[in-house]
Regions:
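Glycan-recognition and catalytic cores of secretory/periplasmic carbohydrate-active enzymes
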Residues: 1-222
């Protein structure tokens, strides 16, 4: 958002802040394998990075699914706004982790390190909003990457996730009394808030991803 405003207003100070923020986030929260930490703790006086942390993930060293989806989507968007290849590479790294750690139905559990032998919400709890965010990001990334084989993999995975999300397991179309579009979203597992419910960001990015997929299909049919 900061970079978008910088582009619209030609405010170079805002652009500098946006780029610095993304670089700091990459350096402190994106791990070598492409996974992400939820939060970073900094010394408020010196600004020194202290450690990775989390409030909504399983552990500080785990991979909170929605956090990884935000990173994948966000760095793809930052590349689109700046044309800085360094941000494209971050999104690609996030995508590789995502693609290699999805379960069979392509919709992630709330944390990639969750113990699936345990029942929800701490264990095998799906997170549909993370899938929606990542699907939208992967569709963008497929058009940005310079690697044709990866473009196909990103696009195919995004479509597979959307295919899963429109099944009765996730789409609330035929669920009486359900006040939302997607089931099995998660806000905050540790606090028991918005667990296995519809969440507004899940709805937004689900519709966004569907529109991108439809528009892509229309372009290919021309």
């Amino acid at each position: 958002l900061i970079q978008y405003v910088a582009n619209q207003t030609l405010d170079q100070d805002l652009a500098r802040i946006a780029v610095a923020h993304c670089r700091t986030t990459r350096d402190c929260l994106v791990r070598p394998d492409g996974s992400t930490a939820h939060e970073g703790i900094f010394d408020t006086q010196s600004g020194q990075f202290l450690r990775q942390s989390t409030h909504q993930g399983l552990r500080a060293d785990s991979v909170w699914a929605r956090g990884l989806a935000w990173s994948l989507y966000g760095y793809s968007k930052m590349y689109a706004l700046t044309d800085a290849v360094e941000f494209l590479h971050v999104s690609e790294r996030n995508a590789e982790y995502w693609l290699h750690h999805l379960p069979a139905d392509r919709v992630p559990y709330w944390d990639f390190h969750a113990d699936l032998a345990l029942p929800p919400p701490q264990g095998a709890q799906k997170e549909s909003s993370a899938a929606a965010i990542a699907a939208s990001g992967l569709l963008d990334l497929a058009g940005q990457t310079r690697l044709p084989d990866r473009a196909a993999a990103y696009r195919d995975t995004a479509i597979a996730m959307l295919d899963a999300l429109v099944t009765p397991e996730y789409l609330a179309l035929d669920t009486p009394g359900w006040e939302g579009i997607l089931k099995h979203g998660v806000y905050h597992t540790a606090k028991g808030l918005g667990v296995d419910e519809s969440v507004m960001w899940g709805e937004f990015f689900f519709v966004e991803a569907l529109l991108k997929a439809v528009q892509q299909e229309e372009r290919e049919g021309e």
